[in-house]
Amino acid sequence: MAKEIEPKLQTIGVYLKKSDIFRIPEYQRAYSWNIANCDKLWQDVESYIAQDAEDPYFFGTIIIDCSREGYLNLIDGQQRTTTFLLLLKAMHLRITEVLHNMADTDEAAGLKRSLQQSLDFIFEILYRADVRKQIEIEKDWNRAKGVKILENVSINELYKEELANIVEAKTFADAEKAVYKFPRKQKDNKYTNFFRNFKSFYEKLHAYQESNLDVLVNGFLTKCQIIEIKSWQIEQAITMFNSLNSTGMPLSDADIISAQLFSKAPDEIDFKAIWEPIIRQADELAQKKVINIDSVLQQFMYINRAKGREYETGQLNTPGVRKYYTVIKPELLNDPIDICAKFDRILKIWSQIQVYPLTKLLLKFNENFKLFLISYLFRVPEQELSEQSATPIMESLLRLFALLE
């Protein structure tokens, strides 16, 4: 007999202290929380702790699919769970530093013991380590590596090892060395959301003296709560997510469409092998402010509408990207391999032409030219595309938009 849905009100500490591995499934989005999201979380916790309220603070509902033994598939709550772990690692480093510098006096003994208990608890969460194993890790930090608390297999996540690189670091400097850096980016812009958010938490914790730090950490672990809803049927878990997801980050067009493509792919491994390079190439072009994955979907929509001569129907309103793929032309998603080849073609065109002087000029001059240019160049055979063949259409677009401006 199938297990029933199991809802539980849990503190953050109890929720994260699991023997099973948290898992972000293939169809989920990439880690998208930014500094603004983390600042909001921090302010909520800080304000709640300052009020010294008796009632717990509620961080919403987290939905978990338990259909695979040993894993907790995060259907709703991946962004919060990842962020909680980044905050815990920042707390781990800061408490370690504070304990190292605290005077060994009778007056400080109680506070020191309380901070050590919090550190022990965080060790149990991040490294599945009891006190004995914690001592072994502190003697040889290599023992902390390879302990898996969260597995990310999302087809949309390019930086799957970032969380582990941060958690496995002994110091902040070690974490900074281990994480990915975007080339040609300066200051915090060179880091992923994972490290930027972790760094922000770590810096905020430096404003706290020993006693205030103890109160903050204890409050976060033992007074802040979530409702964990476990389901042993994935379809049931996703249905609950669709019903309850009113406070999470809105899903992007690419989030929705990639999930549908994944569900329709005849072979999941083959699809991942095709989709992940698309996401990586789109991310590289987005870093250069050329095009992102949502723009790729939009551009193919315009290309396909023009190819189908939809402008002849008299319907002049342009549909939203999501509606076009899921309602108006859902059959486009029935062949994931074919449509991914179209997306890949668009990305290859932009990768090739981004270096052309006229492209650089148009990118600075007017964003709207992209839809016109890609619709034209998509028709050009790949072997015939060159700066010479692209120049006439780009010069024409430059004149047109100069007049419109």
Model-derived features with residue positions:
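Glycine- and hydrophobic-rich flexible loops that cap the catalytic core of alpha/beta enzyme folds
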Residues: 2-307
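A cross-family structural signal marking well-folded subdomains
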Residues: 208, 225, 246, 252-405
